């Protein structure tokens, strides 16, 4: 939601229309098992032939390579003739239930790494993330 709001601020309020009627679609999603939010599936066919800017958040952060892989998976879910014209991904805060699930895991270095990452994700997207999105939007 923070990223979508920033996009509205940077690009200005546009007349809302269906994706089928838009020239450019900004498609934002949290990352679900490495892919787009499943709730978006029914809207994706409307993006055929459209220019699409992909953006989103994922719980694991800190690696551009990981973000790029996630964005590639996002793009692979679009219709074949949709044209990705830009991308942005940053870390996103996860629900407390995720932390509880990590806490219930057997004590291990992996468990600690996951807990540490969860704690780093708190408050994201943060100002630096929003500034990163702001930097790429004017090119649209």
Residue ranges and their predicted role:
Residues 1-3:
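Short amphipathic alpha-helix
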Residues 28:
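Short, charge-patterned binding micro-sites
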Residues 6-14, 24, 32-140:
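FMN-binding flavodoxin-like domain, especially the glycine-rich phosphate-binding loop
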Residues 19-25:
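Short acidic/histidine-rich motifs immediately flanking catalytic phosphotransfer sites
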